[in-house]
Amino acid sequence: MKNNDLNYNLHTFYYAWYGNKEIDGSQRHWNHEVLPHWSNNTWNDLPDFPGGDDIGANFYPKLGNYSSNDLSTISKHINMIKRAGIGVITLSWWGEDTFEDKNVKLIMDIADAQKIKVSFHLEPTKDRTAEKVVKMIKYILDNSNSR
């Protein structure tokens, strides 16, 4: 795909909060509750998921129980996004020194190499104020090699 085939008006969310035992030492976010289906109740009777290969999701990811800190996984995700023609990823971000903060620079570098832009969704942290949001934005600009 050529760079001019990317649509910069088309954004996708990217949740880099998944961890696995091999990369991160433990499972992370794979065993969250499955949200109720909005129109098909047959999906609402699924058992609880303990994590591991039996993950908390209706569909098993093609790349398996991956880590969001794995270079190969991030590269594959960014390539999938590029093949779809999506020009911007929006990172879900919970703030400085969080699990989701560890891989921001890596994601941005891989996305930049593919000419994909990155924006941030500042998740609703506890006791968030306008001043804290300003500090979060300043941190992103200072630490992510913003382009």
Regions found by a protein language model. Name each.
Residues 1-147:
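Glycan-processing catalytic domains of CAZymes
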